Amino acid sequence: VNWSDSERAIITDIFSHMDYDDIGPKALSRCLIVYPWTQRHFSGFGNLYNAEAILGNANVAAHGIKVLHGLDRGVKNMDKIVDAYAELSMLHSEKLHVDPDNFKLLSDCITIVVAAKMGSAFTPEIQCAFQKFLAVVVSALGKQYH
């Protein structure tokens, strides 16, 4: 993947200001609510019976934060994203059996929550760079499935 200086700067800036404790739980909760079939991977998280339960679930919140911090790996390794996520790709495909399409669904939810948080500062240029970054990470996470 070729990254322009502008794209690198945008990605670095977004993550340097990221409120992980807010965005992570909101993004994962949104994914579990909007795409309820994704809940099957979180059966050990307790009550996920409705939106209110998901939004108040401490396990969902903690995992959302963990997932969002997982993107730091990509930010720090933008030129070697596939290598950076090789181990996680293997874990999700061979042990957890996560449908790789779920990574795209979660990335869309992350984009929505980041856009809501940034408001008018989430310009088309910023969205383009952010979604490109997430698409590369999603592809890397799905690499083991190919």
UniProtKB/Swiss-Prot annotation:
Iron keyword on record: yes
Highest taxon above the source species: Eukaryota
Keywords tagged on the record: Heme, Iron, Metal-binding, Oxygen transport, Transport
Keyword Protease in annotation: no
GO biological process, one term: hydrogen peroxide catabolic process
Function: Involved in oxygen transport from gills to the various peripheral tissues.
Summary of subunit composition and partner proteins: Hb1 is a tetramer of two alpha-2 chains and two beta chains, while Hb2 is a tetramer of two alpha-2 chains and two beta chains.
Family statement drawn from the similarity comment of this UniProt entry: Belongs to the globin family.
Protein name: Hemoglobin subunit beta
Organism, scientific name: Notothenia neglecta
